[in-house]
Amino acid sequence: MAERANDIRPGQVLEHNGGLFLVVGIMHTQPGKGGAYIQAEMKNIKTGAKHYERFRSDATIRRAILDEEEYVYLFTEGNIVNLMHPSNYEQITINLDLLGEKKIYLQDNMKIKVVAYQDKIISAHVPDYVTLAVKETESVIKGQTATASYKPAILENGMRVNVPQFIKEEDKIVVYTPDDSYYERVKE
């Protein structure tokens, strides 16, 4: 879809120089001399490389039309992830690498967002918030809770997260997946 460069927003995907680029950030600049332009920080979807591009405000850009579908995680076999569409039960497979480092969060029946461009899957995403049990953590030492402090914990999937002092082993916590941080304790 053709648009003016002035309408570029972070989070959009552009077709540019024969590739797909995710707009990470933009800056509108109006120099004292010459026309206004947009400096866009973009990330190549295929390679992950960052790229900076300058567009004139009145230039025409092409925004990619993406299809997003939610699938349910079934199982992983080797480097292949098997997913099922929740309404028509169609099963698809994707490469585990599409999830990147977030593959550690995969759980049975988890909803996975799959993004396709021209019927080719280009990315997959786990939910922003995932509930996990604390497998191992240090016990609280009395008097150590006067200030807000964190302690390391190992979760059921093997990852390490810093959690507040009141978290005990077997507690369930919510992890914010974009930055792999503690979000809250699950109230039972």
Swiss-Prot record:
It is found in: Cytoplasm. GO terms for molecular function: translation elongation factor activity. GO terms for cellular component: cytoplasm. Pfam families: EFP (PF01132), EFP_N (PF08207), Elong-fact-P_C (PF09285). One of its GO terms (biological process) is peptide biosynthetic process. Involved in peptide bond synthesis. Stimulates efficient translation and peptide-bond synthesis on native or reconstituted 70S ribosomes in vitro. Probably functions indirectly by altering the affinity of the ribosome for aminoacyl-tRNA, thus increasing their reactivity as acceptors for peptidyl transferase. Belongs to the elongation factor P family. This is Elongation factor P. It comes from Wolbachia sp. subsp. Drosophila simulans (strain wRi).
